[in-house]
């Protein structure tokens, strides 16, 4: 069995039952653009907000007394396998930056404004002695050290302030994606346990502190202490540092953007909803696409698709956070390469995204109902794809990439052979050594051949994986109809797929392009896996569990 996704856990099962239908009276989630969810502030918190906004109010900073200080501390927890430093070492056209890295790039930094970046689990983080491990990718190993490090870095900033300078406020903002979003939630949870409520505000070591904003992309815990506990995932990986994901009341505003089409079973979602109710300091927004279509991190042309769809969630998060006072630079003032990562002005991209949003029949309602509405659109497209009625531009692109790579590899091999022929001696003569010039040409041809072989394998594997997922999907749809014919009650997931297959209305071409050119297939990372395109992942609402598959 060949498995390409390092987050894979062999034979993982979830033996604990959960609801297969929406929870009665569940709070509303929404789709795409929506005003932020911010709880009512106390008089003390309103005062602290004005203090925190000092650096972005014209001339306010100059007027502030130098005997006082406001510490602005923003921490960015990247997702599993995401590492800004590793990506920035690549050439621009191969970078796969997450939205967390892009937001960190856009954040201000000076003597009063501190931004701290925490690399994703499974990647190198020398500051905590983590070289990046398979256990980090699969089980979240090292997340606890990252959370502690973020708290230590905060304490270090406080310790830097001279004794004669009064700290007026510690202003905290936090961002995270995937397990990094779980780390961000654990960070504010642990911070809250160290704080005391006083006069309508909060104190940290007798210093005024506020957690102004938490920006989260698609929270996934999947935290395990050993491979054995990971195999039987009865609690979705809510272990050790990830035991409690409830956001503390001290967080003034939380925005959680979640992936409408993620299907992988071992990527259970942790909603910010608790049972049926949303706390007043949080809002959840569905965005189309799978996990990394929302949080970012796909490489350009991965699966023959663009990696630009995540820019819609990126810009939305930036706008809400900026309006809330998070100290981002104005986008127009960012350096060119950073600004380019926010660009969503491509006409085809915008047309496809807008057409998709228009096609979603239910954009606001309980999370489960809105999820079903998004899934119905995707399954209408899958129905056409597996029937061959929808021309697959992404597959055609992969075929071109594969064929071009094969030609380039063959040309490089021919070049190597020609250089070797230059060295042929007479019969019985010793073959002479390469000259420096020949060695240089041969090494260049070898590199070209190896790179081309890698690109060929990548494109060919993607085509193979996509094809096998389509076959399994057809079997699953047939099973739904068989179950119904036997008088078995269908779940919300099964009813949604069946309704999509029986919907005879044509799917707009722009919606097809959305799925085919921009939205990825996260299940197809594997040559074999228990996850299927017909699956919906489990969603946790605190201690409650929606298990549609």
Predicted region positions:
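Active-site- or binding-pocket-proximal scaffold segments within functional domains
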Residues: 2-549
